[in-house]
């Protein structure tokens, strides 16, 4: 059975690249009826954050990514790691190294002077003497001194490394006894039955070391898939300088989780020419063998397009609920359905939608200077005044308002744009709004007449 995992370190928020990695692992497991587990790699007790760990779980919940079983925390497994470190020591596959920091620094300087790659020289590999006093040893694995390390990467294909070029007897336990990253990963992946590891190709250099440990411990090596990085629009690795990278920041900016997942799954994976994928579609079609070898580019416009699509196709009931996160509560508004319909067609984010609704429902305290100067003059004021006087019937529907308005304009010999733009300024304080006919139905005749009156009386229009 396929078993995948997502194993973040809780030293910060869950970033976009991490969510894509989690999504790929999740989809591969679900597409094959397998298991997907969440493991928190919190062995670095100094840098760990409970808040960060909780934020990862919160992001999973928001995105609808469920995991199997309980969350595994590495910090609760130190005894297990010590057991396997001792096993390697007992089998003479690892050893204690008493080399001091000063000795390591000297060795590194000498190697760099000779233009050699800095690496540990193995001086304690077969040490049988009396250990030096005052030094707490690290534990090093006995890495192969020659030969090659090979594996078939599901994305990059056949990978081959010369052991002597890339390996030394690397540390598996620090001098304080805490295990290192590569060691804990191997122990946990093996004991948790992880069959496939999909991760960023920044981990490619770790893979030979982990294979050494799998072989030393007699564990089965999982299938590796190393995914190319996500780049910003400038071709450099995605970072904060390109905008938000925190997954939950996208929620706060008004993106829907299904839009974000749809966007991320297409960063490196494709299924024909399709662009729109529900989570169920992804589960049905996802195959890691179809992940591109090339880096993908984070395209903000594409994300906005997808988000607009999902907003447009969301139920009004859901959008009304989502807007409460932006302090917009229209649950009891008599025209809530029309209000949502008027904005969902053109909104790129929920934040945009909330801002538009708030602008519409709140009487303008000021007027956008550019719009005011362009559309408000003596002629437009007179036209607004006359239009206000014909708004006498209550509870008119948008279609009826449109008919009444067109009759008025025909009588006055005016075009719609000569009324619509000044009316938008009067209603919202800007030149932007949904259809003025829908706006009049939403706000009601009395409110429209009041806003027209307020604009005409405004000192800026004198």
Swiss-Prot record:
GO terms for biological process: glutamyl-tRNA aminoacylation. Its main location: cytoplasm. Its EC number is 6.1.1.17. It is found in: Cytoplasm. InterPro entries: aa-tRNA-synth_I_cd-bd (IPR045462), aa-tRNA-synth_I_codon-bd_sub2 (IPR020751), aa-tRNA-synth_I_CS (IPR001412), aa_tRNA-synth_I_cd-bd_sf (IPR008925), Glu-tRNA-ligase_bac/mito (IPR004527), Glu/Gln-tRNA-synth (IPR000924), Glu/Gln-tRNA-synth_Ib_cat-dom (IPR020058), GluQ/Sye (IPR049940). It holds the Pfam family Anticodon_2. One of its GO terms (molecular function) is zinc ion binding. A motif ('KMSKS' region) lies at residues 237-241. One of its GO terms (cellular component) is cytosol. Keywords: Aminoacyl-tRNA synthetase, ATP-binding, Cytoplasm, Ligase, Nucleotide-binding, Protein biosynthesis. It catalyses: tRNA(Glu) + L-glutamate + ATP = L-glutamyl-tRNA(Glu) + AMP + diphosphate. A motif ('HIGH' region) lies at residues 8-18. Monomer. Catalyzes the attachment of glutamate to tRNA(Glu) in a two-step reaction: glutamate is first activated by ATP to form Glu-AMP and then transferred to the acceptor end of tRNA(Glu). Belongs to the class-I aminoacyl-tRNA synthetase family. Glutamate--tRNA ligase type 1 subfamily. This is Glutamate--tRNA ligase 1. The gene is gltX1.
